[in-house]
């Protein structure tokens, strides 16, 4: 697969370019071996996995219950912010948590993230109006973004670079399973108990996790100065630029094709301002006076890390692309209920998780990761091509088989990206690099909904001349087709089979373009994989923030719980 055979051993002393980092053939004698994994390690890892499960649940658990929530609270057109407020808050705060983890320590930031998520869950569960719900979702989103960031950082601090693929695969599997079962849980709570339990269910689980983290998450923390010195290290300007630019982009992508046409100034102005703001953010990150930027440009200073950041963005975009538009096919073409369509996505969840673990184990055993980029994107490209064949007559075997290919492919790619990113950078950049990786994945998910939505709406608009009813054409134009992609809407035309067939054909036309465009991005990921270099993933663990050893904690480090 074009994999080089260099026996690169990385050092961690300085943020050199990749060429410099990969020049040493022998590991430094002072580099410590990875500690054995005792009961405390596994208790912390399980707690981290549970927090990831909760954060993943709340990205999509309200999707099937949203009509019930909006009806109960009288949200009307504000319903979209019940979803977008969480996504916006979590995405914008990810790099900020990553930088703060280097200043205030991993333990304190992890506990803060879980506490904010729990507080937000309580506010949402007790919400009596839309404003309180949106506020609660925003608080929950900040906590969720912190959980995603800190869980990856803490795991990276506990295991060596070579092992990170396997543990990332497990965390990724937890995420995939939670994302698929979330809509089913949301619908079940809304129909059988109360939609409020969608949020209340987080409280006891988060409480147990919080206790476990307080008791067992004892991490080393190097001295970081006084409170004033710590505050002066925060990149306030970069944080403001990042939050403002991400907010503008999310607003534009939320409005485009639904609230306002894509050609409307109300969509274009915030989109352009947001993209310009992000360029300004990266320009500011390179300012010579900025000692500790939120997202240092050195993270993108070598070919391997910069390429893998782009690959991770594309991969996340494709994952959300498929998971948001297969339900449109299931509900509008195959006439499945929302809960049933969530179940029909199980093939992706049941293969992406084991696929990630398989790739992670292979990477841990051999240190080879490039092959998984090629295999993963090859499977994703093939499956996206096969999705174009789906129609109203497709058998269960077809849509299940196509998803199995995509699921394994996405699992392979997810697990094999972060370890080589960290291998190409010094260990001092673990937190910021992991934060950048998580941010780009979240940001990619936003585009993974917006781009196919634009393609779908464009093709639907051009295909509406096939629909004989002017009333129905008005219902489906300019984003209406996505809104009406439900079993109830389609079956309302059972008494007019010709009109129903015309409507279904419009949906199939729109979805075909969605899958055709996805092929291009899948192939792009495959091509980008050729730019990734083969680096040695070291077995040693060299970090200042790992789990404290009982016999050395008093002499070499101070517990975060006792600091500041």
UniProtKB/Swiss-Prot annotation:
UniProt entry keywords in alphabetical sequence: Glycoprotein, Membrane, Transmembrane, Transmembrane helix, Transport
Molecular function, one GO term: transmembrane transporter activity
Location of the protein in the cell: Membrane
Key word Cell wall biogenesis/degradation present: no
Glycosylated residues, chain numbering: 192, 302, 461
Region (Disordered): 1-35
UniProt xrefs under InterPro entries: MFS, MFS_dom, MFS_trans_sf
Membrane disposition: Multi-pass membrane protein
Biased composition (Polar residues): 1-15
Transmembrane segments: 42-62, 78-98, 108-128, 141-161, 170-190, 197-217, 236-256, 268-288, 308-328, 343-363, 371-391, 404-424, 436-456, 512-532
GO annotation, cellular component aspect: plasma membrane
Family: Belongs to the major facilitator superfamily. TCR/Tet family.
Function, in words: MFS-type efflux pump; part of the gene cluster that mediates the biosynthesis of the mycotoxin lucilactaene and the lucilactaene-related compound NG-391 that act as cell cycle inhibitors with potent growth inhibitory activity against malarial parasites, moderate growth inhibitory activity against cancer cells, and no activity against bacteria and fungi.
Record-given protein name: MFS-type efflux pump LUC4
UniProt organism field: Fusarium sp
Primary gene name: LUC4
């Amino acid at each position: 697969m074009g994999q080089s055979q260099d026996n690169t051993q990385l050092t961690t002393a300085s943020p050199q370019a990749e060429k410099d980092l990969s020049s040493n053939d022998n590991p430094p004698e002072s580099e410590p071996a990875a500690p054995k994994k005792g009961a405390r390690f596994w208790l912390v890892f399980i707690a981290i996995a549970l927090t990831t499960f909760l954060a993943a649940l709340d990205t999509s658990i309200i999707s099937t219950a949203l009509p019930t929530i909006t009806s109960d609270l009288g949200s009307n057109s504000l319903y979209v912010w019940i979803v977008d407020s969480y996504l916006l808050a979590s995405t914008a705060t990810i790099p900020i948590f990553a930088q703060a983890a280097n200043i205030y320590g991993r333990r304190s930031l992890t506990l803060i993230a879980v506490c904010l998520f729990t507080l937000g869950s309580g506010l949402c569960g007790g919400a009596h109006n839309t404003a309180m719900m949106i506020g609660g979702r925003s608080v929950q989103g900040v906590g969720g973004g912190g959980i995603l960031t800190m869980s990856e950082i803490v795991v990276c601090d506990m295991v060596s670079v070579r092992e990170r693929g396997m543990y990332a695969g497990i965390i990724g599997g937890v995420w995939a399973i939670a994302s698929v079962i979330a809509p089913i849980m949301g619908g079940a709570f809304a129909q059988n108990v109360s939609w409020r339990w969608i949020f209340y269910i987080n409280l006891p689980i988060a409480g147990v996790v919080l206790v476990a983290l307080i008791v067992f998450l004892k991490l080393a923390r190097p001295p970081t100065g006084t409170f004033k010195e710590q505050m002066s290290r925060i990149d306030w300007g970069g944080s403001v630029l990042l939050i403002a630019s991400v907010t503008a982009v999310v607003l534009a992508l939320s409005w485009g094709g639904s609230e306002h046409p894509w050609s409307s100034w109300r969509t274009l102005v915030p989109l352009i301002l947001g993209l310009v703001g992000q360029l300004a953010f990266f320009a500011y990150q390179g300012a010579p006076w900025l000692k500790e930027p939120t997202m240092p440009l050195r993270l993108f200073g070598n070919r391997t890390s910069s390429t893998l950041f782009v690959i991770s963005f594309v991969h996340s975009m494709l994952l959300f692309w498929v998971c948001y538009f297969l339900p449109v096919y299931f509900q509008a073409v195959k006439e499945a209920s929302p809960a049933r369509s969530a179940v029909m996505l199980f093939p992706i969840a049941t293969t992406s998780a084991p696929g990630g673990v398989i790739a992670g184990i292979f990477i841990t055993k051999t240190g080879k990761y490039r092959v998984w980029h090629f295999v993963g994107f090859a499977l994703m490209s093939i499956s996206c091509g096969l999705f174009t064949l789906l129609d109203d007559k497709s058998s269960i075997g077809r849509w299940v088989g196509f998803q199995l290919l995509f699921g394994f492919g996405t699992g392979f790619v997810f697990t094999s990206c972060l370890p080589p990113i960290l291998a190409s950078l010094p260990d001092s950049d673990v937190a910021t690099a992991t934060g950048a990786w998580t941010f780009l994945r979240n940001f990619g998910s936003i585009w993974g909904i917006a781009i196919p939505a634009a393609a779908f709406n464009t093709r639907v608009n051009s295909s509406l001349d096939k629909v004989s009813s002017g009333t129905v054409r008005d219902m489906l134009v300019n984003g209406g087709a996505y809104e009406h992609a439900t079993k109830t809407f389609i079956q309302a035309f059972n008494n007019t089979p010709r009109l129903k067939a015309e409507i279904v054909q419009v949906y199939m036309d729109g979805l075909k373009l969605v899958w055709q465009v996805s092929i291009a991005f899948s192939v792009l990921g495959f091509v980008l994989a050729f730019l990734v270099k083969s680096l040695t993933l070291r077995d040693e663990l060299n970090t200042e923030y790992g789990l404290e050893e009982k016999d050395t904690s008093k002499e070499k480090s101070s517990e975060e719980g006792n600091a500041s």
